[in-house]
UniProtKB/Swiss-Prot annotation:
HAMAP family: L3_methyltr_PrmB. GO terms for molecular function: nucleic acid binding; protein-glutamine N-methyltransferase activity. The gene is prmB. This is Ribosomal protein uL3 glutamine methyltransferase. NCBIfam families: hemK_fam, L3_gln_methyl. It comes from Bordetella pertussis (strain Tohama I / ATCC BAA-589 / NCTC 13251). It catalyses: L-glutaminyl-[ribosomal protein uL3] + S-adenosyl-L-methionine = N(5)-methyl-L-glutaminyl-[ribosomal protein uL3] + S-adenosyl-L-homocysteine + H(+). One of its GO terms (cellular component) is cytosol.
Length: 298
């Protein structure tokens, strides 16, 4: 459709249909919150119209003003032509129903660990109220640290990242959730900035993409900070350091929950003697592992 014909797009239904067609025709890469063109289109249209993400049905056939249409079309055009993840266009990302501020200083929140935190890490954590200290390593936007603080309501949570830029984004999110009294942001290289503490839960979504996969990433992913993605030749550079140090920071019954994406083969090659529990979620399989302090010490 030529630009001068786009004035024919009169309703939300029209705009969503057009957006789906554009996204499909351009073969954009998805995976930053949406896994299909319909959901991506609905999100962009509703955001452009300043409507909550769960209010499509009442407005589906509502007509839009010319200024509203222009605003929505600009989002769609930029999504297609610049190959920017939708979250970078809107300045927000949603994870398990929670909204987080994001920009290009952090990767877009999408870790399936969020689902496990939503369930309180049951059955590995028997009572969320018994978790006194939790740690989010490589926190980025702070999303997992915040979800951990919500899951474990009496816990003191530390969140660590090497990037000062990422921690600025995380600080904004922590403030928006009013968690400054229980959630401490720390800048440092993995465990070096941490106090001497025993954590009941450590969650970590580290850089784990192997070198070959980094070179093949779709354009959308290349807008994200490489520091938060690249895990070295086999993707295990930081994982090795984390597993080596983690036992010294876990409580006697503490657990480490670690995301490694599609790198299970590389993980098992690097750590043939480890026997982690592999945790599945609704959206992932063989991407998250759990290890106890006892396992890490053997």
């Amino acid at each position: 459709m030529q630009n001068n014909n786009r004035q024919e797009l009169q309703t939300l239904r029209d705009l969503i249909r057009y957006a789906v067609s554009r996204l499909n025709a351009a073969r954009v890469a998805l995976g930053h919150g949406s896994d299909n063109a319909w959901d991506e289109a609905v999100y962009l249209v509703l955001h452009g119209l300043h409507l909550p993400p769960d209010t499509l049905d009442p407005f589906l056939d509502a007509r839009v003003l010319p200024s509203e249409r222009s605003r929505v079309l600009d989002l769609i055009d930029r999504r297609v032509t610049e190959r920017l993840p939708a979250a970078y266009l809107t300045g927000e990302a949603w994870l398990r129903g929670h909204r987080f501020h994001v920009d290009r200083r952090v990767i877009v929140p999408r870790s399936p660990i969020a689902e496990l935190l939503d369930e309180g890490l049951a059955p590995w954590v028997r009572d969320p109220l018994q978790v006194e200290r939790a740690l989010d390593m490589c926190t980025g936007s702070g999303c997992l640290a915040i979800l951990a603080a919500l899951a474990f309501p009496v816990a003191q949570v530390d969140a660590v990242d090497v990037s000062s830029d990422a921690l600025e984004v995380a600080a904004r999110n922590v403030a928006e959730y009013g968690l400054q009294d229980r959630l401490t942001l720390r800048q440092g290289n993995l465990f070096e900035a941490l106090p001497a503490a025993a954590y009941d839960v450590i969650v970590c979504n580290p850089p784990y993409v192997n070198q070959a996969s980094m070179g093949a990433l779709p354009q959308e992913y290349r807008h994200e900070p490489a520091l938060a993605l690249a895990g070295g030749a086999d993707g295990m550079d930081l994982v090795r350091r984390i597993l080596a140090a983690a036992p010294g920071y876990l409580s006697a019954d503490g657990v480490l929950v670690l995301e490694i994406g599609h790198e299970r083969d590389h993980f098992e090659a690097a750590f043939p003697d480890l026997q982690p529990v592999w945790l599945d979620t609704a959206e992932s399989s063989d991407q998250i592992l759990l290890l106890t302090r006892e396992q890490l010490n053997t």
